[in-house]
Amino acid sequence: MRRIMIAGTNSGCGKTTVTCAVLQALVNRKINVSSFKCGPDYIDPMFHKTVIGTAAYNLDTYLMSNDAVNYLLNKNSGDIAVIEGVMGFYDGFSFTEKGSTHELSEITDTDVILVVNCRGMSLSAMALVKGFKEFRKNNINGVIFNNLSEKLYGHLSEECRKIGLVPLGFLPNIKDVQISSRHLGLVTAGEIDGIKDKMNLLADYAEKYIDIDKILEISENDRDTKFTSLEITKKYNVKIAVAYDRAFCFYYEDNLNLLSEMGAEIVKFSPLENESVPQCDGLILGGGYPELYADILEKNTGTLNSVKECVESGVPCIAECGGFMYLHEIMEDSDKNEHGMVGIIKGKCRKTDRLQRFGYMEMTANR
């Protein structure tokens, strides 16, 4: 199975930019490509989905068994799978490699392209590259330099060859495709004006400065991943309503697919369009950025009332992140204005100015 992983030295080095550039370039070449994200990330897969026009998937070595990781990789792969890493290559749970990009590359036996941000560096970038290559046994095969000039790339490419790595190109500083930050790391793809134009511009830069042909060559991995196929039994005949729009868009594609494979009919509705909850046996309110649309959500009383009636009638409800905020009496928007919400949960919720908790957490039920 053809596959390649794009990893980074650290968060913010340009992994997502490079990944989207490569994905769009492959799509423009009419290649059937599928994309994956290492770890529990909703936002980066939405960028991938915007680029390739199909679902993007998560591979999480902390939450999944090795079998499940390789099963889902094989199940969802096209002619080539492009896997984007998370944080720095070796960064995992609680100062270990558990859940890290490195661990995923080992489990899936995938060749790795390391993205290095050269802003403020020239030759020092190679000390970083050499350190990553020699720190642990790994599958790092090539390097792409971000924020680098063409002149300096010639020197760095020679240095790469000296330590046995393939120089795969670079991206200059491209101001026209800057992706601004949000409180979870990146804005959602749907919030960026002219996103497809930006992605195609990235692809043009990739074709000019990145060796796409060599990436395809490296991806020709004849090492089969080992796994036991998961047997999924269709044993339910239920209808599950899922809030799905710009405000509620944080879902793992494989979770929804699994529910369908087990017999559930997934029916999506939009709180932003004031759609009522359809008749259902279960309700899912996913995460997102509802505080950006709090004024609209407050005005859409049809949805508010139907969600309240649904939950109060005893229909099981899973609400997380923004969906959990939506169930409260009051939600504070980005400008600290208060808006009335569903009211099932007493109290007010708001977004703080900084992350309160980030990463995995393990809990044990007391009852």
Model features per residue range: what roles?
Residues 37, 164-175, 265-272:
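Beta-strand->loop->alpha-helix junctions that form or flank phosphate-binding loops
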Residues 123-231:
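Internal gly/pro-rich beta-alpha loop/helix module
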Residues 110, 165, 312-316:
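A short helix->loop->beta-strand "cap" motif at the edges of active sites that frequently abuts
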Residues 1-2, 233-239:
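A short, charged/proline- and glycine-enriched loop
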Residues 238-301, 305-310:
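Phosphate-binding active sites in nucleotide-utilizing proteins
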Residues 25, 103-104, 159, 258, ...:
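Hydrophobic/aromatic ligand-binding patch that stacks against planar heteroaromatic rings
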